[in-house]
Every structure is written in C-alpha cells, then in structure tokens.
UniProtKB/Swiss-Prot annotation:
It comes from the Archaea. This is Probable S-adenosyl-L-methionine-binding protein MTH_1797. S-adenosyl-L-methionine binds at residues 25-27, 63-64, 87, 97, 117-120. PANTHER family: TRNA (ADENINE(37)-N6)-METHYLTRANSFERASE (PTHR12818:SF0). It comes from Methanothermobacter thermautotrophicus (strain ATCC 29096 / DSM 1053 / JCM 10044 / NBRC 100330 / Delta H) (Methanobacterium thermoautotrophicum). CDD domains: UPF0066.
Length: 137
C-alpha cells in the first residue's frame, strides 16, 4: 500500500501578506490579517452557496515545507515528537487546515485569519458548521 499515489489538483491559490514562514502567525486564529483565495475558473460553480456561511475551513498545500521530516521539536517544547502529534508544517504530506472568517464570496474569497503563505495552492474549501465542527469547549 505504501506505493499508492494520490493526485490532487488545486482549486485555487492563496494571495496573502505572508511571503515567508517567519511572516506567518503560528496559528491563523491569532491573526487579524486578511487574505484572498483566488478560485480557478473551472471551479467557480463550486463556490455557489458558500456565501451562506460566516466561517470556512481552507485546506491548502504547504508548498514550501520540507517533506522528509518525521520528528520535530514542537514550538515551546524541548523534546522531539512525531510530526503527526504536532502542527508543524514539515511532514510527509504537508496539508494545511485553517478555520477562517469568510468576509466576501465570489471568484475571489476574502478571508480573515488564514495562516497560509502567498502562493499556497488551495486543495479544498468546506463550510464550518458550529453544531458538528465544535466540541463545545
């Protein structure tokens, strides 16, 4: 099974003020910066109805991340752990997930709180449903 290959085509691209990893916040929810997600023309029909939501999940490819790293020292810690137990961008399949506020909807989505670097390919977008996505903490 380890020789299985998956192909994913981006549905859009991030345009953000963050050009390098050091520019980006540790977590998007701690940022008030606005970014844009430019949806590719062939996927514009998929945006229909998204305007009904105040928040969305953005799945994106961490295109500048290292992919050969399996253990890292998490931020603020001293001991290495496996990347699956961290939020580190370096990982075998560097997929980013960020819950953002949707400010404007169209062929360009304007969002607040996205931690993706400028030029990051967007893999998917999903609406946030408070009743199923929140654990109520």
């Amino acid at each position: 099974m380890s020789d299985m290959e998956i192909r994913i085509r981006p549905v859009g691209v991030v345009r953000s003020p963050f050009k390098t990893r050091s520019d980006a916040p540790a977590q998007g929810r701690f940022s008030s910066e606005e970014s844009e997600i430019h949806i590719f023309p062939e996927y514009l029909d998929a945006v229909d109805g998204l305007e009904l939501f105040s928040h969305i999940f953005v799945l994106y490819w961490l295109h500048l991340a290292e992919r050969n790293v399996l253990r890292v020292v998490p931020r603020g810690k001293r001991k290495k752990r496996g990347v699956f137990s961290t939020r580190a961008p370096a990982r075998p399949n560097p997929v980013g997930l960020c819950l953002v506020e949707l400010l404007e909807c169209g062929e360009i989505l304007r969002v607040r709180g996205l931690d993706a670097l400028d030029g990051s390919p967007v893999i998917d977008i999903k609406p946030y449903y408070e009743d199923i996505d929140s654990l109520g903490f």
